[in-house]
């Protein structure tokens, strides 16, 4: 029962009140028209796997949300660090160990600005475990960013430090939980060890977690008559916007399907493009076709292309190979 389709069906009734009995009537009438389809039972094992893969997505979304929230506090304390271009940033990862140490160990920006460069270099080396190729340059960029940042009243620095440190602790704790869930997912899927899992795991870039996330939502491929049906179920389809001789180039993704499946397919596409030249070329081709929404558009279209491969392998019970496809015995 899709709430969106029922809500749209309700609009066909003119001048109807919004009450519980009338809601039940609309749902019953919707079912009478034969528009409700039941999902096939996939077994308790797939349901257990689905609980794990969906909980993993929940944790990932919590981490993303916490990072987005923490950026506001980072901007207040160290404004220039938050707005620097990717190539100009002193650290490749704003949420990494060295960045966390800089944001929490130094109470104010003046502590960085007026610190001897030698002490700052030693600090970067220690917190970065000697992994920086040019720690002196990193310290120089860090000091310049501190000089260029806005200054706050001194009473604000301590609360900001506490808030930022708390966010780092929350993120670290949730990342530990994600790793624990990953281990549980691998253990569960290896207990199933289905032919479908072998097919997906044979694709370069798709590991046990991504394969499990996809299979937990698909269940069995016989539920889908074509790769188009699978794409529609994942919500990786685009509506045509056309009138007369005009056809809009800006078409929005429907996103009306299974958002969990869509997430794991997009993540799989992002990983596969780093392992298979064919998908890498396709990604950058789509990336260069437009000037807006480049990354999201290219990734979504690459995921749609990956669906054709996944559907083909699962329906034919085959494993992936760069030169030939072999059948699973």
Q: Model-derived features: where do they sit?
A:
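A detector of single, family-specific signature residues
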Residues: 1-329
């Amino acid at each position: 029962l899709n709430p969106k389709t029922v809500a749209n069906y309700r609009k066909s009734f003119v001048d109807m009140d919004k009450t519980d009995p009338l809601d039940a009537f609309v749902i019953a009438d919707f079912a009478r028209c034969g528009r409700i389809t039941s999902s096939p039972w996939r077994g308790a094992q797939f349901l257990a796997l689905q609980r794990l893969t969906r909980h993993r997505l929940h944790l990932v979304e919590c981490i993303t949300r916490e990072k987005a929230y923490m950026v506001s506090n980072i901007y207040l304390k160290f404004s220039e660090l938050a707005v620097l271009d990717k190539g100009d940033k002193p650290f490749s990862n704003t949420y990494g160990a060295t960045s966390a140490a800089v944001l929490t160990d130094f109470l104010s920006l003046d502590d960085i600005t007026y610190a001897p460069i030698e002490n700052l270099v030693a600090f970067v080396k220690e917190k970065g475990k000697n992994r920086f190729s040019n720690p002196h340059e990193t310290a120089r960029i860090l000091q310049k960013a501190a000089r260029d940042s806005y200054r706050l009243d001194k009473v604000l620095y301590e609360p900001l430090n506490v808030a930022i440190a708390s966010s780092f602790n929350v993120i670290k704790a949730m990342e530990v939980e994600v790793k624990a869930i990953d281990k549980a997912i691998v253990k569960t899927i290896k207990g199933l060890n289905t032919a479908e899992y072998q097919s997906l795991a044979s694709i370069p870039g798709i590991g046990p977690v991504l394969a499990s996330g996809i299979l937990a939502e698909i269940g069995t491929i016989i539920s889908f008559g074509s790769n188009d049906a699978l794409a529609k179920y994942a919500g990786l389809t685009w509506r045509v916007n056309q009138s007369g001789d005009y056809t809009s180039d800006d078409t929005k993704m429907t996103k009306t399907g299974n958002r969990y499946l869509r997430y794991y397919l997009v993540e799989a596409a992002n990983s596969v493009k780093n392992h298979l030249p064919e998908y890498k070329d396709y990604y950058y081709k789509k990336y260069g076709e437009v000037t807006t929404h480049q990354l999201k558009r290219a990734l979504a279209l690459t995921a749609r292309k990956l669906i054709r491969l996944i559907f083909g392998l699962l329906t034919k019970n085959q494993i992936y190979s760069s030169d030939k496809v072999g059948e699973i015995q």
